[in-house]
Regions:
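Membrane-embedded segments
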Residues: 1-80, 95
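Short beta-strands and strand-coil junctions in structured, solvent-facing domains, enriched
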Residues: 11-12, 31-33, 91-93, 120-122, ...
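Active-site-proximal beta-strand/loop segments in catalytic clefts of secreted hydrolases
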Residues: 25-28, 86-89, 115-118, 157-160
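Residue-level signature of catalytic and energy-coupling elements of molecular machines
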Residues: 44, 69, 84, 112, ...
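Scaffold/interface architecture of coatomer-like assemblies
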Residues: 44, 154-155
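VWA/integrin I-like adhesion module and closely mimicked acidic/polar interface patches used
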Residues: 57-60, 80-82, 89-149, 167
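Juxtamembrane amphipathic/hinge helix adjacent to a transmembrane helix
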Residues: 157-189
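C-terminal signal-anchor/stop-transfer transmembrane helix together with its immediate cytosolic
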Residues: 176-211
Length: 211
């Protein structure tokens, strides 16, 4: 089903980051820290599997999620703080504007790689499943600005093959073997099923490098 396919995409990303500390941030109308940074990917996978327990409404607080990830990385070494943001790019909730959140991230040494998926009123191909993404278009320009202001990269994915290629490129940009800390796409607890069904959600993961 759609939810299982969505989790599979994120689980695959985790598998690619052996050696990273990974933590989950969940968000809908607000952002919440679900797990601390950890090298125990199995526990994060378990949390990912259990992450959707309800709905927080048709909303996505991108700015708040960026701010929370930035806060979680403040105690990590300078130069190794990375946020990989996987989202439809439509900010519909929260108290902090994404552009302002990006500036805060930059000022705290956090680099953001923004990955836009779905949107355009079409469907996202996930392991052969066509997942309807709703009528909202992805705010590519906004995501490009978020990535640019923090010294990161912007990527566009419309299917899982594209996501796989993007993950590989990000892996090359942020090698696991390097010392330091990183933040990976955060994950949102309540709106996850709605995110994939309507294309208005945000998926993200907080990751910190192993020293």
């Amino acid at each position: 089903d759609r939810l299982t396919a969505a989790k599979a995409v994120l689980a695959d990303f985790l598998e690619r980051r052996a050696g990273d500390r990974v933590g989950l941030v969940v968000f809908g109308e607000r952002a919440f820290a679900l797990t601390p940074l950890t090298l125990d990917r199995a526990s994060v996978q378990e949390q990912l599997g259990d992450s959707v327990v309800g709905l927080a409404g048709r909303a996505t607080a991108i700015g708040d999620a960026i701010a929370l990830a930035t806060k979680r990385l403040q105690q990590q070494p300078d130069g190794q703080r990375v946020l990989v943001l996987l989202t439809d790019g439509v900010n519909t909730a929260g108290t902090l504007d994404p552009a302002k959140a990006a500036r805060i991230a930059r000022d705290n040494g956090v680099r953001i790689h923004a990955v836009a998926f779905g949107g355009d009123g079409g469907a996202l191909s996930v392991f052969g499943f066509q997942l309807p993404m709703g009528g909202d278009e992805v705010d590519e320009a906004g995501l490009q600005r978020i990535a640019a202001v923090t010294g990161g990269r912007f990527f566009r994915a419309r299917d899982t093959d594209a996501l796989a290629g993007i993950y590989a490129e990000i892996d090359a940009l942020e090698p696991v073997q390097r010392q330091g800390q990183a933040v990976r796409p955060k994950i949102e607890r309540y709106p996850l099923p709605l995110a994939w069904a309507l294309g208005i959600g945000l998926l993200a993961l907080v990751v910190g490098r192993r020293r």
